[in-house]
Structure formats: C-alpha cells, structure tokens
C-alpha cells in the first residue's frame, strides 16, 4: 500500500511540475515572441478562428486575427486567405465566414473552412483546401502560435511561417492557463486519433479531435 501511495504522489507531483513548466513556457513565448519580423511570403494565409457567439458576433481574438489577415493579404503576403472556424450551434453562422467578412478580403480570394471546432481540426480541414505542400502563413495570437504550428505539422504540413495577430487579446490572461491545458489535451487527442486509424471510420475519428 505504501508503495502505491508513493507512486501516486510521484505521479501527482510530476504532473504538477509538467503543468507549471508548460505554463511558464506559454508565458515566455507569448511575451517574448518578436512582433516586428519581416513579413513572409506564401501560397495561402491561414486565419485561425477563435470565439464567436450564437448571434454571429466575433470575440476579440477572432477580430484581431481577421483584421491581421486582411492586412497581410493587402500587403501581398499570399494570394488567398483560408478562414478556419466552425459554428457555435447548428444553423448559426460560422466563425470562418464572419472573420472573412470582417477582414475585408474579397470573396474571390477567401476560402471558407467552416467545420472545425479545435486547432487540430483547423489543421485537418484547412489542409484539405490548400494541400500539405503549400507554403502556409499561420496567423493567430502569439500564445497560440506554437500549438498551431504543432497541429499543422502533425496533420502533414511541410512549409509553415508564423505571424502573430498580437500577443494576447484584451483581458485575455486567463487564456494562458487555458492554453497550458490545451497543449496536453491536444497531444492526447492526437495520439488517440492516430491509434484509432485502423478500426474507426474517419468521421468518428474526426470527432475525436473536436
């Protein structure tokens, strides 16, 4: 019994240390990420969705990302923009469509991916539009960039440039804690998604990434 208790305590403290280390890392890259790098060039800009309410009103993170992607498109960073983000409820407008409208990017150069509900699904569905060999410019807030990069790499993207829409949305410090948990949660979901490839249909496996 004592051995089991020691094992449980060891696992508990290992988990605590891992979470604290992850949190410190998230804070570090959020506030140290350079915002003034030269703009990259690519085949497509990927605008990753954030929050949207049932009425179709974009949250501050989505607004930041949409406006940044519009600016990048007008600067000639890429010829098309893929807006990626699903619907808050059936029948509601997608985050992707609302962000495309907010960005000012013309319909002819905007691509709407309106199915995704997670960063992993952003990657999976966006790459079905662009292909895995396209040169992609990922746009999101600085705190979210590393997980976005890892998600797109995991889904097969080869050439990725990262551009922050800003460090953090206004009053968004709670997002740092959420991102800490999301990193580990995403890793677990991705492992489960890969492990079930041999015996689950694709639609069910896709739901695992929700």
Ranges and model annotations:
Residues 172-199:
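A transmembrane-helix-recognition feature enriched in membrane-embedded lipid enzymes
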Residues 1-43, 199-205:
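N-terminal membrane-anchoring alpha-helices
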